[in-house]
From Swiss-Prot:
Homodimer; disulfide-linked, also forms higher order oligomers. Interacts with GNAS. Interacts with ATRNL1. Interacts with MGRN1; this interaction competes with GNAS-binding and thus inhibits agonist-induced cAMP production. Interacts with MRAP and MRAP2; these associated factors increase ligand-sensitivity and generation of cAMP. Residues 1-43, 107-123, 187-191, 272-280 are extracellular. This is Melanocortin receptor 4. It is a multi-pass membrane protein. GO terms for biological process: adenylate cyclase-activating G protein-coupled receptor signaling pathway; feeding behavior; insulin secretion; positive regulation of bone resorption; regulation of eating behavior; regulation of metabolic process; response to food; response to insulin. Ca(2+) binds at E100, D122, D126. It is found in: Cell membrane. Belongs to the G-protein coupled receptor 1 family. Keywords: Calcium, Cell membrane, Disulfide bond, G-protein coupled receptor, Glycoprotein, Lipoprotein, Membrane, Metal-binding, Palmitate, Receptor, Transducer, Transmembrane, Transmembrane helix. SUPFAM superfamilies: Family A G protein-coupled receptor-like.
Length: 332
């Protein structure tokens, strides 16, 4: 998917010159065709080391999230299980991008006989990236639905969202997204695939917006109703609203990091020859960096918004001989 040294997903989707594969110069030539002055039309170069570094950071951070949720029984709740699914998706997107950079860099030094093998490897990695993107969208939507149930069906929530049902939902999400991701790459010759991806992204945004408008408009009313009941209803609802706010932040970061990529696809479909659209598309590598940054930022959001998760992070880190870090973290 990284087009610094190859066209990645766009080779599969035929967004760049179909006859060229693997070199940054070819990408620039494809974009700059008909624009001899180059400039904005030249493909923005990003060092492969940047992709690899972000991939490694994302891998370590998201593994920490997954291990923390598995380790701490207090985090064995539907919301955190969905967060775990989101962490896996983020990790796969970022690591696949970094891995693809390494593979293509190595294969570019070989002769043309390895080109077909390069394409096959690239298609496999792109399938993983596409599947993980769909899983990210579905995981975010699942977290939103979970927050909706905690706020509006607080008394019946534990009967509705059981661990078994959550496991089935997550399994179905990944099974469906894996099949869809593979099919999207196999049939990527058709523009309908790109339109489908764009439609799914914007449909998700509309669903999220609708859910949140209803959720936050009615939240105060339900908090007042729960408050009159015996027990700690107010505290519970406050916690639920905190979870909803956390999800709002996650969705905001997701939109900021992924929107340029989908705008890129939209411009390719709607105005591939327009100078402004071509100029926007020439920054494709920057949009890939933003996507990888999403996978790096999400674990930081989890840590900042959840004291329990923060505490578990410290316990895991302190398990290793990192006394200096533990001593520093104990002050906060």
């Amino acid at each position: 998917m990284n087009s610094t040294h190859h066209h990645g997903m766009y080779t599969s989707l035929h967004l760049w010159n179909r006859s060229s594969y693997g070199l940054h110069g070819n990408a620039s030539e494809s974009l700059g065709k008909g624009h001899p002055d180059g400039g904005c039309y030249e493909q923005l170069f990003v060092s492969p080391e940047v992709f690899v570094t972000l991939g490694v950071i994302s891998l370590l951070e998201n593994i920490l999230v997954i291990v923390a949720i598995a380790k701490n029984k207090n985090l064995h709740s539907p919301m955190y299980f969905f967060i775990c699914s989101l962490a896996v998706a983020d990790m796969l997107v970022s690591v696949s991008n970094g891995s693809e950079t390494i593979v293509i860099t190595l294969l570019n030094s070989t002769d043309t006989d390895a080109q077909s093998f390069t394409v096959n490897i690239d298609n496999v990695i792109d399938s993983v990236i596409c599947s993980s993107l769909l899983a990210s969208i579905c995981s975010l939507l699942s977290i939103a639905v979970d927050r909706y149930f905690t706020i509006f069906y607080a008394l019946q929530y534990h009967n509705i969202m059981t661990v078994r049902r959550v496991g089935i939902i997550i399994s179905c999400i990944w099974a469906a997204c894996t099949v869809s991701g593979v099919l999207f790459i196999i049939y990527s010759d058709s523009s309908a695939v790109i339109i489908c991806l764009i439609s799914m992204f914007f449909t998700m945004l509309v669903l999220m917006a609708s859910l949140y408008v209803h959720m936050f408009l009615m939240a105060r009313l339900h908090i007042k109703r729960i408050a009159v009941l015996p027990g700690t209803g107010t505290i519970r609802q406050g916690t639920n609203m905190k979870g909803a706010i956390t999800l709002t932040i996650l969705i905001g970061v997701f939109v900021v990091c992924w929107a340029p990529f989908f705008l890129h696809l939209l411009f390719y479909i709607s105005c591939p020859q327009n100078p402004y659209c071509v100029c926007f598309m020439s920054h494709f590598n920057l949009y890939l960096i933003l996507i990888m940054c999403n996978a790096v930022i999400d674990p930081l959001i989890y840590a900042l918004r959840s004291q329990e998760l923060r505490k578990t992070f410290k316990e895991i880190i302190c398990f290793y001989p990192l006394g200096g870090i533990c001593e520093l973290s104990s002050r906060y």
